[in-house]
A protein has these predicted regions:
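Recognizes extended acidic, P/S/T-rich segments that occur
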Residues: 66-101, 113-114, 162-191
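Beta-strand-rich modules
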Residues: 95-117, 187-208
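Acidic Gly/Asp/Thr-rich repetitive segments characteristic of extracellular carbohydrate-active
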Residues: 216-254, 515-523
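Beta-solenoid repeat scaffold
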Residues: 239-242, 253-285, 290-300, 496, ...
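Short glycine/acidic-rich loop motifs that flank beta-strands on beta-rich extracellular proteins
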Residues: 254-255, 282-287, 305-314, 335-345, ...
Length: 530
């Protein structure tokens, strides 16, 4: 009986299992939705003043697309579409005839050609057309220190100009009917030596944009044009005068030799500066500085090529006075016979500086390149300068011992490129003998010189930091002999590097082509890409 019951139960379970297998679902081979997919990957590309290209991904075959465009809209799709396109078969559509500098919303729907009830929902995107550019480029004469003249085709509609500095709105100036008719406006209220974006608007739509940099401050300045008697203007200037030079060549005429350049006597503290950074003025001649006057030069080329003498570019002539400042920045000093400056009287210069300046073609026949004999310079700075093709057989920086005048001169040479200067084994880069001197030498690139540092016991050991040297064999030789053949010190932290591969040293382009040298952060940065 037990066996019969067990067989009966097993048979029943087997029947149940067979019944379950027979109820399996059919294989799913397709999905039928109630509507088509909306276009995916919708993008607005290649915006111009009056066109846009829309692109999307096709969902499946046997569909077309409807495209609607709404102007001055940000995906609200309010009101009526400004453009409608139906029956579009491609998935790329270029739309033209749009309005410049305008916000648009676009939407695309998939149209099922077999069953309109299955049309998709909308896919949306927004974009802005490009602003126009009807501004004409201002000429050099259009740009002043506190204003700029902007022009565009006469009669083209516009309502205002807006002025931006660092993308911040500085001012908005409404246009008059006469200005619109003429296509010309003078934008006022600007600051000197400042970069602005000037934008032309018609309502809220931008029709033009130009970036300008105002020129040096001309407030109260004496304007000097090519052909003016610059020597007379300098010598008649009062304390605090600013001479603003237009581009061109300005000759300090020699008093005795016709056709030659001479010296202008600077007896009052003055500033000489170029007006246009794009057209740096050339001053042919030299300067004799008298009676404790300060002289500041900015954005000027000082050229001694036609001088009647080989004297230095700057010569301090009056003894027993204090000169507060001589400053040369953003400039170029070239083609002088004896040297760059000369202090051979018992006077003090509180600060003498060269900043962002190129100095070259200084022969040094009869003088050293930077030459102080009987005077005292409290602070001597060379910052981000390039000195090259100069001083073939003389010392580079010379400062004799005039320590009876007191003080402790501080010499700073930082971020400079010095190429081929004092290229003679008997000459020194630092012929400094003024007792108590302090020398700071940092971030410099020195190349192609046979010079030594100093063999003088009075030369302070410089504070060296992050300097690089190429082809400077004698700067590494330490013999420790006072007045010996080579050096009392060397730059122990300096790096001997490979050829910097200057872009065009022969023509004064010292952009560094050797990446290993460039990444050290040494040398003059005037050629760095901005």
């Amino acid at each position: 009986m037990k066996k019969i019951a067990l067989y009966t139960m097993m048979l029943g379970l087997g029947s149940l299992a067979l019944t379950s297998c027979g109820d399996a679902m059919d294989e799913i081979t397709s999905i039928v939705l109630d509507r088509d997919f909306a276009p995916i990957g919708l993008e607005a590309k290649s915006a111009t003043e009056n066109s846009i290209t829309l692109e999307w991904t096709k969902s499946h075959d046997d569909v077309t697309y409807t495209v609607e465009i709404f102007a001055d809209d940000s995906l609200s799709f309010a009101g009526s579409a400004t453009n409608t396109f139906t029956g579009v078969e491609a998935t790329k559509l270029k739309i033209i005839g749009l309005v410049y500098d305008t916000k648009y919303s676009a939407r695309v729907m998939t149209i099922d050609n077999a069953d309109a009830s299955r049309n998709s929902k909308w896919s949306n995107v927004f974009f802005r057309t490009s602003a126009q550019q009807i501004f004409e480029t201002p000429t050099e004469n259009d740009i002043a220190d506190r204003s700029v003249i902007m022009t565009w085709p006469a009669g083209e509609a516009a309502t205002s100009v807006r002025v931006y500095a660092d993308e911040s709105l500085v001012k908005e100036q409404a246009l008059t009917a006469d200005e619109v008719a003429a296509g010309k406006v003078t934008v006022t209220g600007l600051d000197p030596e400042t970069t602005y974006a000037i934008r032309l608007y018609n309502g809220e739509k931008q029709r033009g944009s130009k970036t300008i940099t105002t020129i040096a401050d001309l407030n109260g300045a004496t304007l000097v044009r090519e052909g003016d008697d610059i020597r007379a203007l300098i010598e008649a200037a009062e304390d605090g005068a600013v001479l603003a030079l237009y581009g061109g060549t300005h000759v300090i005429a020699d008093a005795e030799e016709e056709g030659k350049s001479g010296a202008a006597k600077v007896s009052k503290s003055i500033v000489i500066k170029g007006i246009y950074p794009t057209n740096v003025p050339i001053v042919k001649g030299r300067f004799e500085i008298l009676d404790g006057a300060s002289l500041e030069i900015n954005q000027v080329i000082i050229d001694g090529i036609d001088n009647s003498t080989t004297d230095q570019a700057f010569n301090f002539k009056t003894a027993d006075v204090t000169y507060p400042l001589m400053s040369v920045q953003n400039s170029e000093v070239r083609n002088f016979g004896k040297g760059v400056y000369y202090l051979n009287v018992a006077s003090t210069v509180q600060k003498l500086e060269f900043l962002n300046t190129k100095i070259h073609g200084i022969e040094c026949d009869g003088g050293d390149m930077f030459d102080c004999r009987k005077g005292r310079i409290d602070e001597l700075n060379f910052i981000n300068c390039a000195m090259y093709n100069s001083c073939a057989a003389r010392d580079f920086i010379r400062m004799d011992d005039a320590s009876d005048l007191g003080g402790a001169p501080v010499i700073t040479v930082d971020q400079c490129t010095i190429d081929g200067c004092s290229n003679n084994a008997g000459k020194r880069l630092l012929y400094v003998r003024y007792v108590g001197n302090i020398i700071k030498w940092s971030n410099n690139l020195v190349t192609n010189t046979a010079a030594k540092w100093s063999n003088q016991s009075k030369t302070g050991v410089p504070e060296f930091s992050n300097n690089a040297y190429f082809n400077c064999a004698n700067l590494n030789v330490l013999d420790g002999a006072d007045a010996g053949k080579t050096n009392l010190f060397i730059d122990e932290s300096g790096k001997a590097v490979g050829n910097p591969n200057f872009k065009d040293a022969a023509n004064g382009n010292f952009a560094i082509g050797n990446e290993d040298v460039s990444k050290l952060g040494v040398g003059c940065t005037l050629w760095n890409v901005k």
